Amino acid sequence: MSSEDVKYFTRAEVAKNNTKDKNWFIIHNNVYDVTAFLNEHPGGEEVLIEQAGKDATEHFEDVGHSSDAREMMKQYKVGELVAEERSNVPEKSEPTWNTEQKTEESSMKSWLMPFVLGLVATLIYKFFFGTKSQ
């Protein structure tokens, strides 16, 4: 949908499409018609029907949809909310993983702790099970 083709809807217009035969909802100020997707939704059609005609942004984000699901949404977009009725709910981003190496201090701790534990275990073993002189 190019920016020239964008259709704008009010919340009242979206609210009228709240049945199994016409299932629209709002996510991040975009309007989606997911009627054709009802039977394919992995969470079942009930989840989508429950949100029909409403702003489903919070529910959508709470579930933690994958990037594939977010990409798939684009084909069901039919328009956007009119500017006066938009909300400011930030999109949740995918978690980022920190792959940076730790400093030398933490690498020293990584071998020091097992060494100390091994030493303590050895001393305890020798104390309890050490050779006894006769």
From Swiss-Prot:
Q: Which Gene3D superfamilies match?
A: Cytochrome b5-like heme/steroid binding domain
Q: Cellular component terms, GO, for this chain's entry?
A: endoplasmic reticulum membrane
Q: Which family does it belong to?
A: Belongs to the cytochrome b5 family.
What is the disulfide pattern of this chain?
none
> Its membrane topology, per UniProt?
Single-pass membrane protein
Q: Which SUPFAM superfamilies match?
A: Cytochrome b5-like heme/steroid binding domain
Q: Matching Pfam families, A to Z?
A: Cyt-b5 (PF00173)
Q: What does this protein do?
A: Cytochrome b5 is a membrane bound hemoprotein which function as an electron carrier for several membrane bound oxygenases.
Organism encoding this protein: Musca domestica (House fly)
The segment(s) forming the Cytochrome b5 heme-binding domain are 6-82
From the Swiss-Prot or TrEMBL record, what is one GO molecular function term? metal ion binding
- Tell me, in one coarse class, where this protein mainly resides: endoplasmic reticulum
Official protein name in the record: Cytochrome b5
- Domain of life the protein comes from: Eukaryota
Subcellular location per the Swiss-Prot or TrEMBL entry: Endoplasmic reticulum membrane; Microsome membrane
Q: Where are the transmembrane segments?
A: 111-131
Q: Which UniProt keywords apply?
A: Electron transport, Endoplasmic reticulum, Heme, Iron, Membrane, Metal-binding, Microsome, Transmembrane, Transmembrane helix, Transport
The UniProt record gives the binding positions of heme as H41, H65
